[in-house]
Amino acid sequence: MTWICDPMHGNTFESASGYKTRDFDDVVDEVRGFFEVHQGLGTVPGGIHVELTGNDVTECIGGAEKILDADLNKRYETVCDPRLNHQQSLELAFLVAEMLSREP
């Protein structure tokens, strides 16, 4: 059995400005919880599914760049689901690396 976390789809919502978006903090909280549960149970986290791009988009709010709802229209490029931008993706990757380094 492989345990996979998909922190993107369950955290999609329509923003006040009408854009389909995700809050980076919600994604991080779900990923962190996924690893904490597995660490507590002594099981192996198999992976995470993340929608991302290397582009400088503004499709998900939050992160170190502090993207706000009012910023979404600046570089909202997706034709389907909102993706983490390059900075948010790196933030998440470093968080996952930190959590993996704690695994027994």
Summary of predicted features, one role per range:
Residues 1-104:
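Expand to "…catalyze enediolate/carbanion chemistry for C-C bond making/breaking, isomerization
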